[in-house]
């Protein structure tokens, strides 16, 4: 069977040409899938009956299956559990912002990074998601809302830069004016600091925002909560991020989870300010740690968080304490997880 989801206009035209189908039908098919959210070939009534039958007999649109949906009490956040064709499961989140709808997608089934504060990594990494599976998360939310998706953040389960090729291709398709027409400037990739592919992404020349999961200001603390720190020293990570900024001129976002008695002291606030002041126009997201069933980590007091924020800001750095969306439905930062049959690997 020929998979049609995750194919560019040119790829679909090539498939149709091989089977003696008129070229213009490819654009009609894209319109059905990505704009009308019609996935049943028999309901694509612009196509002649013979073409609908050929598509039914030879092609598939393998969207993930929606298993469950949770909606936050204020109605602004929706989390969905999706099942892939191999029964692997991932979660994705839709957030209604003042500027439109933003989707947080997963890039892998599980995660190998082992960050102690994150539920996504508890079962280890099972596999990478395909281009169609990443794209499908956005398409499903479009179908649920019947609204244009405004922005995409690759901040769900997985380390996006470990699944580099599939993530990049999915974002390129989302950017394609014929498909979803989402600006690269409305896309963010979050990384734990997978150094080689930070450089690689910088050299793509795309104005995608990079968010670094920093979470500590020295190697010792970072290694204790993020095992990837044992592979890449903090200076290596920051050098790569500086290269990304210098190459793309895109504002860097630093994610810093606040964990009481771990990384939330005033000394660490000063250290964070000193690091970030060297990145022009950067922004720091302070994220109070979110609980989940796997961990017993606690957020600092509101007073502590505000003082921490003020110290970072005193270095001339833009900083906010993130407004959590979806924590009531386990859809906030660090709470997404995946269900799958077996553990593949953990990063050590």
Regions found by a protein language model. Give the residues of each.
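Auxiliary Fe-S-binding modules of radical SAM enzymes
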Residues: 1-88, 242-250, 258-348
């Amino acid at each position: 069977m020929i998979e049609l989801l995750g194919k560019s206009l040119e790829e679909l035209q090539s498939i149709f040409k091989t089977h003696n189908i008129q070229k213009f039908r490819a654009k009609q098919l894209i319109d059905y899938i990505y704009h009308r959210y019609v996935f049943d070939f028999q309901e694509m009534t612009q196509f002649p009956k013979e073409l609908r039958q050929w598509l039914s007999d030879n092609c598939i649109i393998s969207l993930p299956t929606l298993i469950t949906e949770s909606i936050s009490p204020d109605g602004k956040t929706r989390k969905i559990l999706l099942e892939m064709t191999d029964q692997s499961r991932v979660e994705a989140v839709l957030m209604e912002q003042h500027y439109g709808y933003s989707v947080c997608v997963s890039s892998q089934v599980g995660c190998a990074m082992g960050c102690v504060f994150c539920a996504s990594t508890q079962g280890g990494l099972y596999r990478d998601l395909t281009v169609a599976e990443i794209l499908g998360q956005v398409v499903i939310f479009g179908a649920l809302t019947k609204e244009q998706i405004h922005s995409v953040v690759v901040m769900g389960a997985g380390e996006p830069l470990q699944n580099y090729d599939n993530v990049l291709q999915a974002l390129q398709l989302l950017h394609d004016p014929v498909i979803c027409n989402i600006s690269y400037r409305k896309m963010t990739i979050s990384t734990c600091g997978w150094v080689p592919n930070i450089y690689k992404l910088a050299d793509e020349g795309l104005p995608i925002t990079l968010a670094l999961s920093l979470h500590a200001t020295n190697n010792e603390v970072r290694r204790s909560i993020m095992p990837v720190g044992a592979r890449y020293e903090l200076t290596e990570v920051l050098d790569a991020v500086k290269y990304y900024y210098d190459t793309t001129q895109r504002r860097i976002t630093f994610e810093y989870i606040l964990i009481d008695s771990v990384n939330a002291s005033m000394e660490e606030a000063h250290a964070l300010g000193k690091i970030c002041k060297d990145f022009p126009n950067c922004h720091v997201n302070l994220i109070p740690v979110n609980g989940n069933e796997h961990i017993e980590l606690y957020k600092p007091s509101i007073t502590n968080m505000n003082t921490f924020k003020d110290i970072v800001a005193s270095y001339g750095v833009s900083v906010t304490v993130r407004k959590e969306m979806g924590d009531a439905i386990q859809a906030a930062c660090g709470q997404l997880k995946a269900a799958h049959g077996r553990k593949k690997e953990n990063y050590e």
